[in-house]
Amino acid sequence: MTLLIQNVRCWNGGGFHTADVLLQGGKIKSLGTSISSDGVNALFDARGQYFLIPGFVDVHVHLREPGFSYKETIATGSGAAAAAGYTTVCAMPNLTPAPDTPAHLAEEQAIIDRDAKIQVLPFASITKGRKGSGELVDFEALSPKVVGFSDDGCGVQDEGLMREAMARCKALNKVISAHCEVNDLLNGGYIHDGAYCKAHGHRGMSSASEWKMIERDCRLASDTGCRYHVCHISTKESVEVIREAKKSGVPVTCETGPHYLVLCDEDLQEDGRFKMNPPLRSRSDRRSEERRVGK
C-alpha cells in the first residue's frame, strides 16, 4: 500500500515548508517537492492544512503498570501517546513493585516489550521502595536499562543521600529527575497555602516546600556535575531558582504541566477534581511559569 500526501506543511528544524510525502507500508519512503503520483494506491491533497513534524517526546508519564492497572496501563497510555503524535515517552517509577532492583525492573520491561505501542523508556527509583529516604538503589546494576532515576511522588529528604545519588549518576552519565518536596514544610496541607486556602479554612502547602529542595539540589548538581531535571514545577520561586542556576552553568532542566499554565488556586471552587500534587498555585505563580515556557 502506497500513499502520496501532497502539499503538507513539513518541519525542517527552522520552520515549516510545503512538500509531498510518499508512504509505503505505513512508513515514509521519500519526502520532497512534486513527487510523482504514478503507481500510488492512494492520493491525498493536504492543501497546506496538515502538518508533518518529528515525533514528540514526553519525559514524564505515568503508565502505572505493574501495580495500578486500574488507573492506566502501558498499552492504554502508550496508545494514547501514539494517537497524539508521541513516539517516545519516559515512564515514572511509581509502581508496585517499584523498579528498584533489576528483577523488579524486568517485570515492568516485560510488559513494555509485550504491550507498548511506541518507545517507552523506564525510570528506576532513586531509593529502595521509592520512599525518598533510607537506602539507595544499585545504580550501577540498573543504569544500562533505564533512561534515568527518579523517586517521583517523593522528594529525597536527606541531602547526603541525594549528593551520593548525584555523584553515582554523574559517573554513569544518567539524569536525576526529581520530585521536589520538603516534607517538613508541607504542614499537613493539601492545597496551596494562599488566599483561597486561608479564606476557606483549609490547610496549605507552602511554596517553600518545593523551591527549597530545588535550591538544595541545584547546589548539589553544581558540586557533582550531575544532570538534574526538576519535575512539574509550580511556583514562581522555583522558576527563578532554576533560571539563576542555569545562568551559573548548572546542568539543570525543568518541566511543568499544562494545568499549572492555565489554572490557579482561584479556580478550586471546593472541587476535589482540582486536587493534585504539587497543588495549583497562585495567579502570580501561573503567570511566572507562562512567561518562562521555552526559555
Task: Annotate each predicted stretch with a short phrase.
Residues M1-G39, Y50:
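N-terminal metal-binding scaffold of metallo-dependent hydrolase/deaminase domains
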Residues V8, G26, Q49, H60, ...:
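Divalent metal-coordination and catalytic microenvironments
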Residues Y50-D115:
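Metal-associated gating/positioning segment near the N- to mid-region
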Residues V59-E72, L121-G134, G153, H202-A208:
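Active-site mouth loops of central-metabolism enzymes
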Residues Y70-S78, R130-E140, R216:
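Short, acidic/polar
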